[in-house]
């Protein structure tokens, strides 16, 4: 009797298994909710990890990341690019977005801080104690992001203007489209020094070294907001909440960012 019951039970179970689709197929059939995040290039490493952590905590959600210069990203949004979350490396760019009604004002919040540094290739013998030393003949190529569209370029320009060096050093500038391009140029030894954020130098500390911390007249604060044309504003808000959560802030801290 037991053997017969066992065979019947086994047959029924086998039929149920055949009738029930595999878990992987069920997961594939669930609708995936995407959130598209356009973020400043200096956030590349931190936001990549943040996105992965958010996805693990929110099954069925997918974070699509787009990095670039803050001004360039603003232009993309202004031209209708599908973006749900916008994160910049300065207040000025976010102010422009808000003035053009491209973001939801009440969703805007600062989530991180950074500092400006001057870097050189790790094997460089240069020693720079103050910006005036950038006049030295040994420094002929200086990587600096375009101030017209990149926040780190504006911070760098302001520091050089304050020191009375902007015009004199201009012939030595190698303009870049974003901070990671400046970092790349320095790491490959294609320029003598470059202006980047401390977090960028940290991300490539085996290939570049910080030769000077650059004081700025305004804090380097990072704002984030939901875009006005977001196709998934609820998920966008959840992602922003995650960035500001204890877990999100811990990830940012691991990458060298300060608290807002």
Regions picked out by a protein language model, each given a short descriptive name:
Residues 9-24:
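Bacterial N-terminal signal peptides
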Residues 1-5:
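N-terminal secretory signal peptides that target proteins for export/translocation
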Residues 7-10, 128:
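Low-complexity, intrinsically disordered regions enriched in charged/polar residues
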Residues 27-58, 62-67, 71-81, 88-91, ...:
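Exported/periplasmic ABC-transporter solute-binding proteins
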